[in-house]
């Protein structure tokens, strides 16, 4: 009798499985870190849109003393126009030159931009003070040199010496006026340099004085939309039930999240119902896209939707810094993904009622509609595949 040995299937060593799991986890955490860190690491403080009031000569003088490309200046006729531009979200702040220099900020638009403009005001004040001191020193030097002449001569203190003093004072005044519009000659008795006033046109609320709450609110809203999409995809079947679940989630989730953000923490301001509607639209749009991708391509669609929302849309949403600071063109792209759209709408509803948010609302509706279309297409695709298999 012969004995035939059955070959045993080869099994990989256990340590290889452990190594593979560790490598996959390492790659995953590195991708997550890169996704969230690179917008900040590559950000550049430049091209901040700011309104400016003053003559071209004054604007040129101030511009020459600033780092190149720091600000994108938009000349306006007067202070009122600058304030209107801030309240409509056309600019982040304003610089008023002339006899009463002033820096206009909006901490509600961006605490980072507000701090930067405050620094610009500090530098302007330093420049004005230096010009005044230089003018006074020049006047004193000319007075001292004129005081050494013989009495009654050409350099007598009451004649040419006084003229020299007046000329020096006029020169100092001209310098101060070019920088910020001083009213008095720096060398004149009792002359004081103009003070650069800083005004927060649209301040943050007392409940969120540093804007940190509004900045981090985008993450739970993004995760909320993603979690809703995943749960609906896994727990609900059928196109009608999918769409009904998305609609109900948008309504209930919007009311609940807005209630927490506004009623509990005071992060959101103004009308609660408007904030709830915007919040619900945002999370419904995210959930809709994830459900649609899952219906169309299966379980990988959930991963695609999560990556698009969490690891692409959220880091470039510009909730923590102006979009102009994010590496182009990603700052602008982020404003048309759901996290950026939701953040902009909620910020404007809370603090900038004069801002036009129609474009952002329609864009969110567009994302919601895209998810619905993908859901319907996926349903018909699955039905066709089932009929083919049965036939």
For each predicted feature, which ranges?
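Hydrophobic core of alpha-helical transmembrane segments in multi-pass integral membrane proteins
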Residues: 30, 253-258, 368-377
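Alpha-helical transmembrane signal-anchor/signal-peptide segments
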Residues: 41-57
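Short beta-strand-to-loop elements that line the ligand-binding cleft
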Residues: 71-78
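Generic detector of multi-pass transmembrane helix bundles and their immediately adjacent loops
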Residues: 292-391
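Hydrophobic alpha-helical transmembrane segments of multi-pass membrane transport/permease proteins
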Residues: 7-45, 219-227, 310-314
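Transmembrane alpha-helical segments that form the functional core of multipass membrane systems
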Residues: 210-318
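Transport-system extracytoplasmic interface segments
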Residues: 57-70, 84-231
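Terminal targeting segments of Actinobacterial cell-envelope proteins
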Residues: 1-16, 192-206, 331-334, 343-344, ...
